[in-house]
């Protein structure tokens, strides 16, 4: 995917993210098989980025960190995100028991997971981190900013057009359009 394609150019950001996760969440580089600073220096020297398994670990920890930060806020209860919860459940349940769906005991966690997945899957592993570095906003405000951009620029329509491109479009070109 895009993260793998851009792994070399985003290695400095990935390194800062790993450092931040280690400091804030106790991420264990050895247990997670993530490179230490000296190993990152070696990757830079030879022009490599993180490998796919390392990116997968970074992706998982990034999503967990954003989710934890968002759950500490009122964002999952905000009216602008109310449409997320029903979409998680099959249509039959939404139609048959809408009140039970709306009152689901894990609704905050479900909404948060859906929001975090959309942000990271669409904007990339580094989006929330870079926005925080550049502007000082927290993860919840980064999620809000993403939703505003999605709405203002009608990004779902663009994503649908990219998805509809013929299979003959090179992956790198489709990735560049998606980013």
Go through each PLM region and give its residues:
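Ligand/cofactor-recognition surfaces for anionic moieties
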Residues: 1-179
